[in-house]
Curated annotation (Swiss-Prot):
Family: Belongs to the SecB family.
Gene3D superfamilies from the UniProt entry: SecB-like
Subunit details: Homotetramer, a dimer of dimers. One homotetramer interacts with 1 SecA dimer.
Species, as recorded: Sinorhizobium medicae (strain WSM419) (Ensifer medicae)
Name of the featured protein: Protein-export protein SecB
Length: 168
């Protein structure tokens, strides 16, 4: 005789095992500017200064579905002259189920962007290569450190807001 429900040995139903699924990945916004072309494509004596910015945002879509957007921007300059500017917002729709509530923010702001990053990195590399420059291969990003820094900044903001509220 078989039963259709899983149990943990004491007759009660088990919680479903935690799962993280990617339902979709997409380019939300992509921009590449090469304002000095074709002069910017000429050989130069030194490497350009490259400034890279990274941001992650997450928004709920449904009970267990979330839209996570990894934003990457990079500017290359030779002195004060802009060589290129690339901006990418790369999103993923994730289904997150069976995780304790205290694990949700780390999942959304560390694990989800970690899964999106290789694809976003390739898009940026292709855009810079297609713009006439060597492909920009962004180094791996420590999303755990970014998340910790973000949480620390939000804690400070909350403390300042509480101090301002009690002072009024």
């Amino acid at each position: 005789m078989t039963t259709d429900s899983a149990s943990n040995g004491n007759g009660s139903a088990q919680q479903p095992s935690p799962s993280l699924n990617i339902l979709a990945q997409y380019v939300k916004d992509l921009s590449f500017e090469n304002p000095g072309a074709p002069r910017s494509l000429q050989a130069r004596d030194r490497s350009p200064a490259i400034n890279i910015n990274v941001n992650v945002n997450a928004n709920p879509l449904a009970e267990n579905d979330f839209d996570v957007v990894l934003s990457l921007s990079a500017q290359a300059k030779d002195g004060d002259k802009m060589l290129f500017n690339v901006e990418l917002a790369y999103g993923g729709v994730f289904r997150v189920a069976g995780f304790p509530q205290e694990h949700m923010l780390p999942l959304l702001f560390i694990e989800c962007p970690r899964l999106l990053f290789p694809f976003a990195r390739q898009i940026v590399a292709d855009a810079t290569r297609n713009g006439g420059f060597p492909p920009l291969m962004i180094d791996p990003i420590d999303f755990a450190q970014m998340f910790a820094q973000r949480m620390a900044e939000e804690k400070v903001r909350a403390q300042v807001a509480n101090t301002n509220d009690t002072a009024n």
